[in-house]
Curated annotation (Swiss-Prot):
It comes from the Bacteria. PROSITE patterns: RIBOSOMAL_L36. Keywords: Ribonucleoprotein, Ribosomal protein. GO terms for cellular component: cytoplasm; ribonucleoprotein complex; ribosome. Belongs to the bacterial ribosomal protein bL36 family. The gene is rpmJ. GO terms for molecular function: structural constituent of ribosome. It comes from Mycoplasma genitalium (strain ATCC 33530 / DSM 19775 / NCTC 10195 / G37). This is Large ribosomal subunit protein bL36.
Length: 37
């Protein structure tokens, strides 16, 4: 899990999901997991 100021989808499997005012990137590639805030 990377915590970043700006989250971007890295590959075509990355999905941006908003949960409780936190932006997350969920992907089947474990390296691409990110969250913001």
């Amino acid at each position: 899990m990377k915590v970043r100021a700006s989250v971007k989808p890295i590959c075509k499997d990355c999905k941006i999901i908003k949960r409780h005012r936190i932006l997350r990137v969920i992907c089947k590639t474990k390296k691409h997991k990110q969250r913001q805030g």
